[in-house]
Amino acid sequence: MKREGKKVVPSLSNLIEKFSQEDVIAVMEKEYQAAPARLIPTSLIDDTSFIKDIVIPKDVVSSFAAGLKEKGFYNPLIVRSKGDRFELILGRKRFFGAKKAGILSLPCVVRDAEDEEVLLMLLADTRDNRSANVLEMAVVCKQLSSLFGYTQQTLADLSHLSRSQITNILRILSLPDPIKKDITLGKLSYGHARALVSLDGEKLETAYKIINEKKLSVRESERLAHALINNEPYLENSEPIISFSGLISSSEREKSITLNFNSKEDKE
């Protein structure tokens, strides 16, 4: 631990150890259920500044609004003080659902958290929440990297992913805004996005248009991207031709054939 004035600031190793744990957010929220919650006017709570551009689909907001009207709040929101207002840390869907439902005051636990810890909480939440959007994880990882110098390996350890997966997730941020919007709204999956980031320029525009018009699956989108990269015709509803080179050897006695594939992907 290190001291900054009178405030104790967790070290990087302590933060990583804490937020790399499974279900750290679920445990945290369970602890907050027993803590005294404070009713805060909804009008005084602002969305988290880090992921405010990630739009929650209207149907999801409406579903949460209906649930809150029927059952009320089970878990309080987690917020932090920002001057005379409050900034949301966790509970975005409940927050926007409550606003749509017209709920005027919300139970909140006010947490004293610096920006780095807030981002780590958001990353752990997207990691543990299967319904979270991959673009949200990309935005959080990018900010941890640019603001606090987190390496891709550290982000991979925190996210329980491989370094190459983190690289692919971060590449999504380079996609044009209309594509990122479709990812946010759930119209395109991470698999679709991964196929699209391998393209640029006119090829990217072409692939995006075809994927939307023909409602291609992830596998079909990958075949389309492969065809565009290699300037080959895209054959819908067909398996890609696997290419291989080198020796094709056989043994009369063992009745075997040896194929040398061009890549691990072709072999699989």
Predicted regions and their residues:
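Short, ordered loop/turn segments at secondary-structure junctions
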Residues: 111-114, 160
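Short, contiguous strand/loop micro-motifs
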Residues: 51-52, 81-82, 128, 139, ...
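Switch/connector loops and helix/strand junctions flanking conserved nucleotide-binding motifs
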Residues: 116-119
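Short, Lys/Arg-enriched anionic-surface-contact patches
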Residues: 75, 123-137
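Amphipathic alpha-helical extensions and coiled-coil-like segments
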Residues: 2-7, 15, 25, 41, ...
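Short hinge/gating elements
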Residues: 46-54, 122-127, 254-265
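Short, charged/polar connector segments at secondary-structure boundaries
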Residues: 1-111
